[in-house]
Amino acid sequence: MPTGNIERRKLLKLIGSGATSVALAGCQGTQQTETTDGSSGSDSTATEQTSDDGSGGSGGSGGNDFHFIAGQVFGTLDPAEQVDYTQGLAAQNLYDELITVDAETLQPTAHIAESWDTEDEGQTWVFTLRDDVTFSDGTPLTADDVAYSLTRMLELQRGYSSFWLDYLDPSNITVRDERTVAFEFNQAYGPALATFVQFYIVNSAVVQENEQDGDYGNAYLQNNSAGSGAYVLDNWEQGNSIEASAYEDYWKGWSEDSFDTFRSTVITEESTIKTTMQQGEGDMTDQYMGTQAYAEMDSYSNVRVPEVPQLQLFHFPLNCQKAPTDDINVRKAIAYAFDYDSAVNDIIGGGGVAAGPVPREMAGHNGDLVPMEQDLDKAKEFLDKADYSVEEINEIGLEHVVVAGTELQRQMGLLNQAGLNELGIDLEINPLQWARLTDRATSAESTAHMTNIFHTAKMPSPDSHTYLMYHPSSFGSYISQSWYSTDEIAATLEEARKSTDLQSRLEKYEEAQALIVEGMPSVYIANPPYRIGINENVEGWQYRGVMSFDWDVHSMTRSGEGRAK
């Protein structure tokens, strides 16, 4: 199991490299980059170790079928729409990203793009593609596919399109030749390279053939894959499971012990997840269960539970455009009523109390921000200043949405309810399936007053925990459910994105965090550790920092005759 110190250095490196200035952009995507702890780019790998003798557990069922147990449904299989971990899991295995995250250095590195350069003082990015990549129908992946895929994202305006919408017009995406594509931004864009880890490429010919009423093939991609990824979609039962088979001619090749099939089953009850893993019927879990679930799985002879620091925030975004949480004093009362110590130590079981939106392990975190502590006297003081009385708050009603079927989520809701009850405030805890939660997040009117959200880094940059949460152009996603910004916050975040100097950019992100916290748009609860359950007969798992990249099934193999039992 990796040590915390090694992993922490690598996390710092992840963000430092992802925010690399355009002057460092270059040939093979493996440039040495500035880090906040002064370490070089040569730390030991983030590979999680198997049992001491390397033998894994005894043979069981499963063979070369990889079974991932997901605690939430897959809302979409279109890579242009993916924004959460199950959607990212599908994209990561069915498609290829332009740039990936190196598993050893956690830096952005070559993938479909084998090299890149900048022109016009960092305003234009030019990518040279590999010449040995084919889609699952056997046709070669070319610059035309890359250009179409990014144009498609900009036109659909979904998923992570906000990374580029304000900076890149489709008319400025240029195919120079079969292997070269250029993106001419309307200004220098500091985190550009980091953003392309969330840009997945589709087969332009197949998608265009299956467009319906200008949907850019969206309906088609809900039941079919059109990628160059390691696996090809066989079946998707929305809300239940996806199944995929290995693409024989995948450009990265296969080993004898690679997984022939990949499937993910949605199981929301922790007791069922634990039983499935204990009986050797599952290969891997997600990271969103309660601490007791992982402790119990770690005691199983056939399951191991790695634990490493991660770039993640757990918080309750407070809907700032909906009464009564549109009142800053109500928001402050809610925040001071919450029991942070119990949340971190008893429910999550590790990590630390968050200090603002950017995880404390991330370069660019504002170290001047102080973690919150429960203070019921202060909570009552702010409540007395509010435009709403306790009676009016209760008459309007406060809704707290939690993800259905997850014990940790339920306990967090109850802990929040207990604190608010001390103030005389009633709280409705509303368990929802993830797909319904994300649907409701598309408008301020339908978004709950507060919602349990785990927000993992979406790219190697603090932009992920600032711009994506608090810039108006990002509103309408589960990530931005506070519906909060100001002109000053928006301008500061825009200045951060314009800067091509790493240190200047990080300073702007720190400035933005201070402005954000003043408005109390969230109850910032924790920066949890990363834990998952892994069957002992799975090898090759690596922590890679960015959400869902850890679940690249092609990078893992089976030891033994099947799953350990």
Model-based region annotation:
Residues E114-G159, P324:
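Aromatic- and charge-enriched surface segment that lines or borders ligand/interaction sites
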Residues A219, Y247-E296, E307, D426:
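Ligand-site clamp/hinge motif
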Residues T142-S149, E178-E184, G229-A230, F259-T261, ...:
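Alpha-helical secondary-structure segments
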Residues Q87-D120, L156, F199-S228, E248-T261, ...:
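Short, solvent-exposed loop/beta-turn-alpha elements that line the ligand-binding surface or hinge
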Residues L165-N210, N235:
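Surface-exposed binding/hinge segments that line
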Residues P2, I6, S17-S21, Q28, ...:
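Detector for C-terminal structural segments
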Residues M1-G62:
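Haloarchaeal acidic low-complexity proteome signature biased toward cell-envelope/secretome components but also
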Residues L14, F68, Q238, F262, ...:
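Ligand/substrate-recognition segments at binding pockets and active sites
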